């Protein structure tokens, strides 16, 4: 795991309510898109075209790939489209957690977009997976998301 991950305590976490919902970005390779489809969870895709935008008005977990060159090079790790989406105060306010993907060939910067966003937004970094992910990753993430929402719904009753 990454050394710069901020520990988020339970008192810091605002758990989501409603039903599990994922907002994600996928490049033209569609790796993240194909992974999200396997989750079979309601979702919304951040547009690839930087001029386009979306707005979110409900709790969500962000899933993003990592763009990074490995080693100490983390500049540009968070895709520009994700930065633009999160620069919208309303979109940012509904983010409850983050999941990232990456390539283990890049060593310490594998999935580093997740910890960067987690630290910036003070939300939990929930999981990371490699490239297209595995069936195990799909199962783990579904379990994490449903538990996260269940806890949030129970706390607000």
Swiss-Prot record:
UniProt xrefs under InterPro entries: Flavoprotein-like_sf, RNR_Ib_NrdI_bac, RNR_NrdI
Gene3D superfamilies: 3.40.50.360
Any one biological process term the GO annotation gives: protein modification process
Secretion signal, residue range per the UniProt entry: none
GO molecular function terms listed in the Swiss-Prot or TrEMBL record: FMN binding
HAMAP family cross-referenced by the UniProt entry: NrdI
General function of this protein: Probably involved in ribonucleotide reductase function.
Family: Belongs to the NrdI family.
Protein name listed in UniProt: Protein NrdI
Native source organism of the sequence: Mycoplasma capricolum subsp. capricolum (strain California kid / ATCC 27343 / NCTC 10154)
Classification of source organism: Bacteria, Bacillati, Mycoplasmatota, Mollicutes, Mycoplasmataceae
